[in-house]
Each structure stands twice: as structure tokens, then as C-alpha cells.
Amino acid sequence: MSWQQVDDPEKVESWFLRDTPVFEILEELSPRRDEAVFDKLAMSAFAGTPLEMALRDLGIRAFAIAGVALEIGIAPTVWHAVDLGLIPVVVTDACGGRDHSAMQRVLDDFRFSGDPLLTDVATITRLLAARPSSEAGP
């Protein structure tokens, strides 16, 4: 309710209804045919989805994460990943948010704990480009 700035549960509206424009994946970010897409059902992308099992089945122990709402969507996923023994790499300048002071608190918490790694788009792009082709994946 606080995110939508309403004081009555009856006034809360779902913003991300399947098959609506706000739910669509941008063309520039469209997954390849060999990439899986999981609908995020809760604050953490791991809650109610097969994401953890998929990552473990593929032998993935670390992953990059970015998105629209650092303070309400990305942070819960990052902390859940840490609890699961995974290494989240937060691409800080590819994370948006509505409440800048809350975003700063989240980043400060990440830095304080040392569990998630923090990077920026330029660094992760350079590192991914430098990978040998055998590591590049499909």
C-alpha cells in the first residue's frame, strides 16, 4: 500500500497484469529462444518460482541482477539469493527505484554486509566481453 501511496487495501491495484503493456519485455531485452523466463510472483524472484532449481541444475552459483525497483524488488531477491548460498552481482547503475533515500539505504546495506557484489554496466560489460567463447554460453 505504501508503494502506491494509498491507505485502503481496496484501492491497491495490480500494476503488472499478464498480457498488458506494462508486463511486456522490452524488445531490446527479449530472451532468446533458448532462454527461460519465470514470472516473478513475490518480492523475491526465488519465491514461488523454479529459479533456484534452474540455477543449481545449470551449475550457476553467481548471477547479475538489475531491474526497475531496487528497494522493493531487487533487494528481496538479492537477500534471498544470499540465504540460498548464491552470489548476486548487483549492477547498480542498471537499477531504478522510486525512493532515492531507500535505494541508498539498500546499497549501503549491501556494502556493509559484503554478501552481494556490486558493479556497474561498464565493468560487467567489459568482463562479459572478455570471456573466452567457450564460456559465453548459447
PLM region descriptions:
Residues 2-138:
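Active-site-adjacent betaalpha module
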